[in-house]
Structures are given as C-alpha cells and as structure tokens.
Amino acid sequence: MPTDLMDRYPSVDDLRRRARWRIPHFAWEYLDSGTGAEQARDRNIDALREITFVPRLLQGELNPSTEVELFGQTYAAPIGIAPVGLVGLTWPGGDVALAKAAAEKRIPYVLSTVGTEKPEVTGPAAQGMGWFQLYPPRDHDLRADLIRRAADSGFTTLVVTADVPTASRRERQRKAKVRVPPKIGPALIARAAVRPAWSIETLRAGLPRFKALEAYIDQATMAKTAGFVGANLGGTLSWEYLEAVRGMWDGPLVVKGLLNPDDAERAIDTGADAVVVSNHGGRQLDGSVASILSLIHI
C-alpha cells in the first residue's frame, strides 16, 4: 500500500470507517451484517480479541518471513481473501480487483460461485493465486461443469462450502431493503445518490449479476438467476456428495465451514486436503460457537 494510504488508513478499522462512508447504506449492510441478532458475529470478534501471544525473545539476528507453503505452493503470507457473494454490490468490478490484488501480493483469492464475475475472467486475473468456492449444485451435470470451468480457468484449489444448507435470515439486510434483484425506488436512488463515486462506477459497469451462473439460464436476468440459485444450489451436501466431488477434482480440495472436530476428521478421511474452520462470519447460525474457539479443538 502506498505510504499516503497507510498514513490515512493505518488499521483495518480505519478502512471500515472509510468504506462505510464510500458505499451506499444497503451495500454496507449486506457486507457487514450477520444473521439474527448477530450474536455469532459478535462472538467471533470478541473471541479474537481475547487471543494473546507469549513471545520468545533474545533469538539473535532478526530475519523474519511471513511466507508459507500450502499444497506445494508458496504464498507471501498465511492469509487470503475469503469468498464473498455479490461482491459487485460492494464495489463494481470488485471480483477482478481482488483477484489482481491477490496476484500482486501472492496470497490466495477465493472466487464465490455467486460472485459477480465469471471464473473465465477472474481466474486469469489471479495468476495462479485463485481458488474456486463451490456452493454444491443439486444437478450432477451443473456440478461437473462448474468444476471443469474452474479448472480450465486456472483455479488451483476447490473450496466446497458445507455450512449453507439453506438461506439464513439476515435482519439488518431486510431492514436495509437488500434485494436480488434490487427494487429500484426513491429510497434506493436517494441512498445511492449520496455516494456518487459508487453510483458512477455502477452506471459504468451495470448492476451486479451472478455471471458464473448465467451460462445455464436462457435469456438470463438477475431475477431469473436469483431464482436459479435458490432452486439449484445447496441443501444436498453429504459425505457421499463430497466423495463424488473429490473424484471430479484433481487439485487440492478444501471443505469450508466446519466447527466440529469429528466433521473435520471425517472430511480428511473422505479425501479433503484441508478444512476451513468457520461459522460463515456469523452469517448462518446465530447460536454457533466462535470460529477461533473451534480451531483450538480441531
């Protein structure tokens, strides 16, 4: 990050405050909200704040490195960009911008099945840093084709999301009138108008669409694609399903959204190479344990 930006935004909290004033209210509520009363979301934050370190000192000459090797590939840091659906609502062209940033910084970038750009565009932009997140399709042929497209587009790792058997209730999003497709009316226009940079970029790029899925829909519109997502993705994941996915994908396979040690162990036994210990950012089950506390046991 350029020095002037580091001076203006030295912390993540500074970036969050800036983002909140740069994008419309409904986009912020989509990005920032959890499910229900947001207790799981808050537990995540509170538990992370309680994690502390006991440093070892007097270790001689300093030669620190944040590099880590994972699945035979070296990354610049042990962090990555997690999958986020509907990225284009937060900022037009966000999927490609994130992929390019990941390529520049040599960290993983995970494209969501319900991202707003096609894998054929985002994969090359990630330059080998791309992973593809799969919401499990019910249809075998759809599943096989999405996996094929991810491989053909240069994604190295497949991430199967396990913790979305059905859509969750996100009350802040309902209050903010977050809809797919958006219902364009006076309130939405007023909120967009006071965020001119976002509005201008959206006018240039068009409203966000689930572009990866439009290939399977005749005369695709956002309404049709949203209906397709509800009818075809999720609700079917089982250990047998995961085993079938393992047979379709030659590269590293990750299962995302596990909190139970027994599930994590079984995922590895079923053929997964790794798991992501996650409660979906507190966006699925409000009564779930904080992710970092499950990591201790897994």
Residue ranges and their predicted role:
Residues 296-298:
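Conserved small/polar residues in nucleotide/adenosyl-binding loops
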Residues 113-116, 137, 236, 254-261:
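Glycine-rich beta-to-alpha transition loops that act as phosphate-gripper elements at the mouths
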Residues 79-82, 109-111, 130-134, 158, ...:
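Hydrophobic faces of well-ordered beta-strands that scaffold small-molecule active sites
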Residues 24, 81, 102, 160, ...:
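Conserved, mostly hydrophobic/aromatic
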Residues 76-114:
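Glycine-rich active-site/cofactor-binding loop and its immediate structural neighborhood
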Residues 106-108, 125-130, 154-156, 248-251, ...:
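Glycine-enriched alpha-helix->loop->beta-strand junction motifs that scaffold or abut catalytic
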Residues 163-164, 274-288:
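Glycine-rich phosphate-binding active-site loops on the catalytic face of alpha/beta enzymes
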Residues 1-72, 178-237:
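An N-cap/entry alpha-helix motif that binds or orients negatively charged groups
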